[in-house]
Amino acid sequence: MAPTKDSVIHMGAESWDEISEFVTKKGHGVKGLSELGIKTLPKQFHQPLEERFSEKKILERASIPLIDMSKWDSPEVVKSICDAAEHWGFFQIVNHGVPLETLQRVKEATHRFFALPAEEKNKYSKENSPINNVRFGSSFVPHVEKALEWKDFLSMFYVSEEETNTYWPPICRDEMLEYMRSSEVLIKRLMEVLVVKGLKVKQIDEIREPMLVGSRRINLNYYPKCPNPELTLGVGRHSDISTFTILLQDEIGGLHVRKLDDTGNTWVHVTPISGSLIINIGDALQIMSNGRYKSIEHMVVANGTQDRISVPLFVNPKPQAILCPFPEVLANGEKPVYKPVLCSDYSRHFYTKPHDGKKTVDFALMN
């Protein structure tokens, strides 16, 4: 049941405590605020002027590369993928091998979870979840953000089938597991292309595999319609810290990618393509490639008329992995740009501050 105005906060209130009580502590999220029919965005969500998005920033008639993966190991496709990773950091793929029926079930399960009553979703909040690997929340890191983001999320870190069956929300668990299993072949193919063929790494052995794809995390993101979308963001400027991310988005749109080699502040809208998946390079692979592949700033704008969902699957190094350039990349005398960094330290650094563009990767720069 949707909350009523009488049951929650005075929307004219200035206190974060009232907003926090409703959004986070009671589990309504920003979806609950949207469902109240509020006409004015609470000031806690107002982004600084320099961070707000304008249509004037969009590079018209531009798009990220679209790649057909049906012949994924052909020289032409290998070149297209590696070029996209180097010059864009983002690309869309079709004929990727993940069944379209699986993708549809994932989207339906995402809507089912966020349609749950607040008290059910709140069972997975930071304060109530029985395990750290499953977390429902809003924004990014609210306790350190000066301006909150207009987004609710469910984050699930995969450890084992046993833990998943015990702790992941039953209303979406099976669909997310099916999606993760269906993505394994795609993940291996992308690693073969980007690392073995692109970076000339001899092989992905039992030592290197955990360094590249040692863990998985899946997020369910919900961006409700917003009364003043021009004042806030769904997600602020950032790059992912993953090796790479596989993103499923719905047909609404809203994801924008910063254009590389651009001296101005221009962005490219990632137009939804039915049946496609979006691949974006993460900081970890930028470090391991010594900067050849690029993790690119991206953001999600708020929408004033429609709700939006997305489901990123983060393919991450194992927390105990050491991030550093591959020796093969440096074999011809190339100087390392990045120092060795423990993956868990890098991740901890990312999650202790608000989204701030590409500044996280500076943590790994050589002194």
From Swiss-Prot:
The lineage of its organism: Eukaryota, Viridiplantae, Streptophyta, Embryophyta, Tracheophyta. Its EC number is 1.14.11.61, 1.14.11.62. One of its GO terms (molecular function) is metal ion binding. One of its GO terms (biological process) is phenylpropanoid biosynthetic process. Induction: Induced by UV-B in leaves and petioles, but not in roots and stems. This is Bi-functional coumaroyl CoA and feruloyl CoA ortho-hydroxylase Diox4. Its cofactor is L-ascorbate; Fe(2+). It catalyses: (E)-4-coumaroyl-CoA + 2-oxoglutarate + O2 = (E)-2,4-dihydroxycinnamoyl-CoA + succinate + CO2; (E)-feruloyl-CoA + 2-oxoglutarate + O2 = (E)-6-hydroxyferuloyl-CoA + succinate + CO2. Binds 1 Fe(2+) ion per subunit.
